[in-house]
């Protein structure tokens, strides 16, 4: 499986450092980074977006943000994103039952291991990741009751960042990179 287009044969010198960082962080020469070299402004802005997204905050731990990333990947049905964001499920302590709920195979509310805040973050991510966007007032009331303004912005920007990558990966036909050893897409 390959992308719709090939990477450029020559990469501008100022993007080579970013490609080196990507390889150092992921252990791979990622196709998305190489394809973005066709339009250096997109490569630079995408790199900045990726570098500045929250991976933990004082009240939003790594697990909650991981759940948001994985849920956004699954809702957008992006194979590359699912592969990238599910590789460390065990580090984030995502159980098989929780994964089934994220995949939509079981109800999130029925999973006792999700905290109230995690359930709300998952639902918020689903709402952010669907088209058309719709945020029921009753849900927003619950959200603002359980999260600070800062936390809501971090949840929204994390989900939006994954959605950016999901649409970009799919628009360029980028296949999974092989980070995880199994497909996390729910069965058809």
Where would I find each of the regions flagged by the language model?
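Mobile cap/lid helix-loop segments that border enzyme active or cofactor-binding sites
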Residues: 1-60, 186-188
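Short acidic alpha-helix initiation/capping motifs at coil-to-helix transition points
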Residues: 41-47, 77-81, 120, 129-137, ...
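Iron-sulfur (Fe-S) cluster-binding segments and ferredoxin-like electron-carrier domains
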Residues: 41-44, 82-101
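Amphipathic alpha-helical hairpins
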Residues: 59, 63-67
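N-terminal hydrophobic signal/anchor transmembrane helix of membrane proteins
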Residues: 66-86, 100, 105, 153-170
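Acidic/His metal-coordination segments adjacent to aromatic residues that form catalytic metal sites
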Residues: 102-116
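Acidic/histidine-rich alpha-helical segments that form the ligand environment
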Residues: 113-156
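Preference for long, well-ordered alpha-helical segments
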Residues: 142, 149-188
């Amino acid at each position: 499986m390959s992308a719709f287009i090939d990477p450029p044969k020559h990469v501008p010198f100022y993007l080579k450092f970013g490609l080196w960082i990507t390889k150092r962080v992921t252990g791979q020469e990622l196709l998305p980074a190489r394809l973005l070299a066709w339009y250096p402004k997109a490569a630079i802005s995408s790199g900045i977006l990726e570098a500045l997204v929250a991976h933990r905050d004082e009240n939003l731990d790594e697990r909650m943000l991981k759940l948001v990333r994985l849920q956004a990947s699954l809702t957008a049905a992006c194979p590359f994103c699912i592969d990238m964001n599910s590789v460390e499920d065990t580090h984030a302590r995502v159980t098989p039952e929780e994964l089934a709920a994220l995949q939509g195979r079981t109800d999130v509310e029925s999973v006792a291991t999700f905290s109230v805040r995690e359930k709300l973050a998952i639902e918020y991510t689903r709402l952010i990741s669907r088209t058309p966007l719709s945020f029921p007032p009753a849900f927003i009331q619950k959200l603002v009751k359980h999260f600070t303004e800062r936390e809501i912005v971090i949840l929204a920007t994390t989900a939006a960042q994954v959605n950016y990558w999901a649409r970009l990966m799919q628009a360029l036909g980028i296949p999974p990179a092989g980070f995880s050893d199994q497909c996390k897409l729910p069965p058809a």
